[in-house]
Amino acid sequence: SMSPDGDTITLSSLKGKKTKLIYFWASWCSFCEEENTDLVRIYKKYKSKGFEVYAVALDEDKEEWLSSINKYKLAWINVSDLQGWDSKYVNTYNVSATPTTYLLDKENRIVAKDLIGYELERELESILNYTGPVN
């Protein structure tokens, strides 16, 4: 999908990042306002440790999408095909509401769904601080 600058950024390009959150949201989604604020805080805290957010907006209006990105200062990866609920991601990830989140591991496998706030932080702590089995 396209970034605001028109670049195509794929999820597969994020392989190797320790963990990433696919975040389905939209500028018209009132429940996403709180989620945006919370995620921005969590993103700032864990970004340097290998956490990335891949935010897929189910918007159709590019101006509204961009205006929301600026309003909430969403500095992570923002993409949208501006197809709303007809977005290919909706089927691929079985999204039926916004916000919906999937936490992915290094290999882009889904490890958790719809974790927010403290629960998300706890999971991130566990993933990002895991150094592998002790020999």
Question: Which residue stretches match the model-derived regions?
Answer:
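N-terminal "domain-start" segment that seeds a small globular fold
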Residues: S1-S13, E125, N129-Y130
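Short acidic-hydrophobic, aromatic-tinged amphipathic segments that line or gate anion-handling sites
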Residues: M2, N78-D81
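Structural microenvironment flanking redox-active thiols in thiol-disulfide oxidoreductases
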Residues: E33-Y72, G84-V90
